[in-house]
Curated annotation (Swiss-Prot):
Name of the protein this chain belongs to: 4'-phosphopantetheinyl transferase AcpT
Disulfide bond entries: none
Organism (species): Salmonella typhimurium (strain LT2 / SGSC1412 / ATCC 700720)
Database matches in PANTHER family: L-AMINOADIPATE-SEMIALDEHYDE DEHYDROGENASE-PHOSPHOPANTETHEINYL TRANSFERASE (PTHR12215:SF10), PHOSPHOPANTETHEINE TRANSFERASE (PTHR12215)
Gene3D superfamilies: 4'-phosphopantetheinyl transferase domain (3.90.470.20)
Amino acid sequence: MYQVVLGKVSTLSAGQLPDALIAQAPQGVRRASWLAGRVLLSRALSPLPEMVYGEQGKPAFSAGAPLWFNLSHSGDTIALLLSDEGEVGCDIEVIRPRDNWRSLANAVFSLGEHAEMEAERPEQQLAAFWRIWTRKEAIVKQRGGSAWQIVSVDSTLPSALSVSQCQLDTLSLAVCTPTPFTLTPQTITKAL
């Protein structure tokens, strides 16, 4: 089973959480998205299992919970991918101009990924950049890696993992799962 839930950071970060969990929230710019992610998790699972953190900081449920999850946010949107199949990764990005997006693609995309982007019409290449970027990030996050490892991922190569993605208006969303899953707008739940 896979469950994908999208929500708004600005709304969810004010949601109800136990005081002990709120006390764990980081201060500064990450606080609102951290709280929003925990609210999404607590709405999906009650009670919320105890969490631990991997070497690269990836949150996970403690050993007793046979569930896996991953969170991602961009702008005011947050995504939760929940699984009972194994480790998962997700990435969401607002499709937006970025000053150095072509240079970044040259630096981190494989030849196959670069060819995929260049095959698009010029007006579609920015969306293709974000499509490839989210796919790479989802793979790295499924592995529990850090953003610095994105350059070592070639998302065009065959893999035992399943990667699926879709575009929702101005959002690019990708998921990486251990078993086949097709991400479509119909498979996504919107949090209130």
